């Protein structure tokens, strides 16, 4: 890819990047979209007391977030490690804010509009006061999380960002970026290796030991004590692995990687829920193996791969859509979930057309946000606030 080509993966940077990793990020974002469709059936079951709430299709789709964290560590380390003699910490923060925050704001606005479309009705049937919804909107725009049970946690489900739930991962992504700029980038490869191993041990203890009680690596979405520390470890371990991979990476040209890795992600996310009989969470153990061993392998393969022609164009489109799709699809899911609950629908067979509409609408909305808002706004912010660097 040419150095002056616009890319959603690394906006305003002049260093070439890995197109296949962009594409895999897009594949993972689409799988998150499908995962949340099936999560809706589980949520409706639990809300209506009609089932056990286990997600039975794409059961492990939530660990796409952990795949994103590895990609983030890899891309940031690759893009910035050798630039600190030309760039200071504030310039780095500006770059990352320009990259991430415009769509975060748009996601909050869309989330507010989606909530308004159902009359600000909470999951328990009560109505959230308009003033507190506006407070939640403002706080989300400034990335200030809601603590469970405070008035501006307006949906009553304990989410950090009740207008747009996936904002929790951006909260930890920001922490990862700040950690990188302040101290992680200064670590030697040996120290980073030790740091990553220690984080891996903490990660295994927390999740395989089922400290959260979730029997899965699904923490971080709320700000209670278990979820905050669990979410922090959940982000830092794969993020540091991504950094370590970028520093030690030795490329080899491998053909067909995009399709191999895409199929692998589908298969890994589709493994059925693994029930546990003792104190060890076998479900979390499987997800830990994915995060600690299999995802880094996929990132390495993606960085080794080459794409041209139709596959290359597909990777560019997927990469550009990945972040907008991730950050704007969930407000539509809230409406979908409310519809499932009210109509007692718990399987895809009973709502195939509506589910297809949700998927198409989410992708279309992401594309419109990308082209009409995200790209123009980031270009303007870059011209306004970033000095051209060599």
Q: Whereabouts are the PLM-identified features?
A:
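Helical transmembrane-bundle signal
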Residues: 32, 69, 75, 108, ...
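Alpha-helical transmembrane segments and their helix-entry boundary regions
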Residues: 21, 91-92, 100, 169, ...
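Active-site His/Glu-centered metal-binding helix of metallohydrolases
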Residues: 27, 38, 68, 171-175, ...
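Loop-to-transmembrane-helix entry motif
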Residues: 96, 100-104, 321-328
